[in-house]
């Protein structure tokens, strides 16, 4: 139990006292007046009278030239945008918010990519994420508060009637306030970027990556702020009450997040759209950036429409009744504004249609309820096949063509299936990966077969063999499969197959029999749909489960061979000895083959790598044999490569002496993008996230050497999983 004593108690008391004092001081000193009165009214009047006595009443006032064209409106927009920007900068309340925000950022300090208490080097993407996280709510405070202040600025100063009588478009007025507030965001963003660069410099890190700063703030934070600012101005214009408007903006923001959690998260109706996602040194923003920008443009155009509507129904003059303001709105709709609105509306509809075409036609969109119903139906209809006797995969021989720039692949080859049971097998059940981009182009079996497509909606096929498979007999299953990327999907789609740093495993390929991973997982939802409770662990002597006890349930161990092709700048890696490497048709090819059986669980990795190589010597019955040690890493991520290499050697020494001989001729570590934050062991290969060890800033005197530790942990799995189960 955590006890509030000692330093923890004093810390909490200090900040509570600080907060109370700040609140009292702010309450006493805060002033909503636009102009601070530094002199008494009597002195101001005396000064004005004294000045007027020296004024020449015969001064000739020049004639004003009347202009009402677009150039005139553009000039107004620029001047008023600058005016409102400066007016906010001059307000003490604004700098009070900024100073409080900076204090909290400093107090929270900077924890960058912490892994078990070990910070990472101050890479730009870590700095950007930290600044985004700590400053986001202060941006929201400024947005909510100053959108109300700007809409009510003239009425707060009681100059609204004079202001409303000017020959100025209501839209230009509101747009000027909108741009002025966005300029405030830009200034704060520049300040945050500058502080990030200063922090990197002080920390001795000089790879600033300005494009990452730009993307993180000007493509991610600023568009969201602009879209919500449009909404805030619309609400303030609609309700005609500053404080009610502020509350409604806050309530809307909360509800918007809540409905997304409840499943209404499609980018076409989730206000503002989804976030950009993580940046990776290996893959940048990858394929996520283009759809993100399209969706943000869609919502920005919607925000402009809200701004136009807000300007039309805004209070101008003495009329405050909403119904009457709506009736008056048509008289404010000038021809230039109407044309501008038509262009915005037309573009908004076209982009919305384009998004719908990509997310709902080219790709399939499932709501949470639809996905749940599918899982329920899958289990109710196919559960009968869970323990049906099936052959085991004993050989895998594949040729994979990977196209990183298109995010596609094509694979063909065969599985050798062996009947390891004592029963005749008349039908083989095949489950395709339930992903729309994956297509099984063909499947065939030696000796002839017929296909039962009764469960096609689940991508589950039953192949009735012409000749039943006798115990200990084998049959080859030939197949061709492709993964084809079509447009863009809803949300941050597939992060396994990317431009640089592809990492997926053999779950992509056809599997045998019923697959429990497609069952409904949540126990409450299972009860609602009358499904039995799932058992986390089977009894140790359960004969049905013992048949499929290994990690690859459809295999007891395989001989593996693959030829894999990838783009010319990349290296493709899978388990096994590298028999041959060559280039053909401007593509790199690699031929791998295992010399000992492995579990049916292997990874495919491809990226543009730097390589560090070494050797470790193993003793096999008195004969010394070399094991190739290789670390494939992103250029610039060499900070902890030596630690990882030492860990590989030390781990192999210890485990070989205390467990058994290491069974492969190589051990490879391959870095993959930080879309996931783990390392995972496969036979002879260890895919390793760039965020979990490669950029850790390890202090040998005070930190746990996490790069060494994680590597040692994963190497241990080469025995406890890879060797035990193979």
Regions found by a protein language model. Give the residues of each.
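Terminal transmembrane helical anchor/hairpin motif
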Residues: 1-29, 36-37, 242-328, 359-364
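Secretory targeting signals
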Residues: 109-113, 121-138, 175-240, 279-281, ...
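Glycine/proline-rich low-complexity spacer/linker segments in large multi-domain proteins
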Residues: 366-369, 481-556, 614-616
């Amino acid at each position: 139990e955590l006890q509030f004593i000692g330093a923890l108690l004093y810390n909490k008391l200090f900040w509570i006292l600080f907060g109370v004092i700040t609140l009292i001081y702010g309450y006493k000193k805060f002033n909503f007046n636009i102009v601070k009165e530094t002199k008494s009214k009597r002195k101001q009047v005396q000064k004005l009278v004294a000045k007027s006595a020296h004024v020449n009443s015969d001064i000739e006032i020049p004639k004003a030239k009347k202009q009402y064209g677009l150039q005139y409106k553009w000039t107004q927009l620029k001047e008023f945008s600058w005016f409102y920007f400066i007016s906010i900068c001059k307000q003490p309340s604004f700098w009070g918010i900024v100073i409080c925000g900076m204090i909290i950022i400093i107090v929270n300090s900077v924890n960058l990519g912490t892994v078990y208490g070990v910070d990472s080097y101050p890479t730009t993407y870590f700095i950007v994420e930290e600044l985004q996280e700590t400053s986001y709510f202060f941006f929201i405070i400024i947005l909510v508060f100053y959108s109300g202040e700007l809409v009510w600025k003239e009425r707060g100063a009681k100059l609204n009637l004079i202001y409303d009588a000017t020959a100025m478009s209501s839209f230009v007025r509101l747009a000027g306030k909108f741009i002025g507030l966005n300029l405030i965001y830009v200034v704060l963003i520049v300040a945050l970027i500058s502080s990030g660069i200063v922090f990197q410099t002080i920390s001795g890190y000089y790879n600033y990556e300005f494009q990452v700063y730009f993307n993180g703030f000007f493509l991610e934070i600023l568009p969201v702020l602009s879209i919500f600012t449009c909404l805030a101005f619309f609400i303030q214009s609609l309700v005609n009450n500053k404080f009610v408007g502020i509350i409604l903006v806050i309530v809307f923001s909360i509800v918007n997040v809540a409905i997304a959690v409840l499943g209404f998260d499609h980018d076409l109706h989730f206000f503002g759209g989804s976030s950009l996602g993580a940046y990776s040194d290996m893959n940048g923003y990858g394929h996520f950036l283009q759809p993100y920008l399209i969706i943000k443009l869609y919502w920005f155009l919607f925000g402009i429409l809200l701004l136009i509507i807000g300007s039309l129904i805004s209070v101008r003059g003495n009329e405050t009744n909403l119904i009457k303001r709506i009736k008056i709105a048509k008289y404010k709709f000038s021809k230039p504004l109407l044309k501008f609105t038509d262009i915005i509306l037309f573009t908004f509809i076209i982009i919305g249609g384009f998004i719908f075409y990509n997310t709902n036609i080219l790709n399939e969109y499932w709501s949470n309820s639809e996905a749940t119903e599918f899982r329920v139906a899958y289990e109710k209809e196919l559960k009968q096949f869970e323990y049906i006797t099936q052959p085991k995969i004993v050989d895998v021989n594949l040729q994979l063509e990977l196209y990183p720039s298109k995010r596609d692949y094509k694979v063909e080859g065969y599985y050798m299936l062996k009947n390891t049971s004592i029963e005749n097998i008349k039908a083989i059940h095949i489950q395709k990966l339930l992903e729309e981009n994956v297509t099984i182009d063909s499947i065939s079996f030696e000796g002839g077969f017929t296909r039962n497509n009764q469960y096609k909606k689940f991508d589950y096929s039953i192949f009735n063999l012409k000749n039943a498979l006798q115990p200990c007999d084998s049959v080859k299953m030939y197949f061709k499969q492709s993964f084809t990327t079509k447009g863009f999907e809803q949300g941050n789609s597939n992060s396994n197959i990317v431009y640089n740093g592809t990492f997926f495993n053999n779950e992509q390929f056809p599997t045998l029999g019923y697959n429990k991973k497609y069952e409904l997982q949540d126990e409450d939802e299972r009860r609602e749909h009358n499904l039995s409770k799932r058992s986390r662990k089977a009894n140790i002597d359960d004969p049905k489960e013992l048949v499929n006890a290994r990690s690859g349930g459809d295999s007891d161990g395989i001989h593996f061979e693959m030829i894999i092709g990838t783009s010319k700048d990349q290296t493709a890696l899978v388990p096994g000895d590298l028999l041959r490497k060559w280039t053909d048709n401007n593509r790199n090819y690699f031929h791998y083959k295992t010399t000992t059986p492995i579990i049916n669980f292997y990874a495919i990795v491809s990226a543009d790598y730097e390589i560090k190589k070494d050797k470790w010597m193993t003793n096999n019955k008195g004969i010394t044999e070399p094991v190739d040690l290789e670390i494939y890493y992103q250029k610039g991520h060499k900070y902890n490569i030596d630690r990882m290499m030492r860990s590989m050697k030390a781990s192999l020494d210890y485990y070989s002496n205390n467990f058994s001989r290491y069974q492969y001729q190589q051990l490879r570590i391959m870095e993959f993008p930080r879309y996931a934050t783990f390392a995972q062991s496969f036979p002879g290969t260890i895919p390793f996230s760039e965020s979990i060890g490669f950029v850790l800033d390890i202090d040998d005197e005070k930190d746990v050497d996490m790069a060494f530790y994680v590597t040692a942990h994963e190497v241990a799995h080469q025995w406890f999983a890879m060797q035990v189960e193979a």
